[in-house]
Amino acid sequence: MADMPISNNAMATCLWFDKQSEEAAGLYCDLFPDSQIREVTRAPGDYPGGKSGDVLTVDFTVLGRPFLALNGGPDAGFTDAVSFQVFTDTQEETDRYWDALLADGGEPMMCSWLKDRFGVRWQIVPRVLMEGLRHPDSATRERVFAAMGEMQKIDHAGIEAAIDG
């Protein structure tokens, strides 16, 4: 049982899955530091969409942030309008997150975006990219922006080369 119920937070993100909430939470918690499954709530009896013992919700944290995964059925889906940005310091960290989130059916997108196998959208964003996009020199910002526009997964060395001119 969790030390503190999710309702003790001022706010939490709820992710609506068909029936994969426990699998998704497990992937995210295994991948990211400061992440854990805190509580799994199961149906106390049979109901129209399932049976007693089915997972209803999973209370978990990712990178220290509270989430609730809900097995709500197939009526809702994820969209490009909402994504989770994860900031990275090294190419190895970028590669690890990118590859793990794409495994088993994810879809890469341009400019650091991807859709994982559950349909959740992520942006794996190297901090060097953000530094380049905020650079005080407009020509540097333009080079970094152009380099990013050619990439799916961001290549740290490519962004550093764009910064250096």
What are these regions (language model features)?
Residues F145-A161:
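Terminal, contiguous helix-loop blocks that mediate binding/assembly
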Residues F17, S21, D30-L31, V62-L63, ...:
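Vicinal oxygen chelate
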Residues A10, D54, E107-M109:
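Short, small/polar residue-rich loop motifs at catalytic or cofactor-binding pockets
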Residues P5, L15-G64:
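Core segments of cupin and vicinal oxygen chelate
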Residues L129-A146:
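A short, polar/charged loop-to-alpha-helix boundary motif
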Residues A12-C14, T57, S83-Q85:
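Short aromatic/hydrophobic contact patches that present stacked aromatics
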Residues M1-N9, H156, E160-G165:
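Basic/polar N-terminal segments that are highly enriched at the extreme N-terminus
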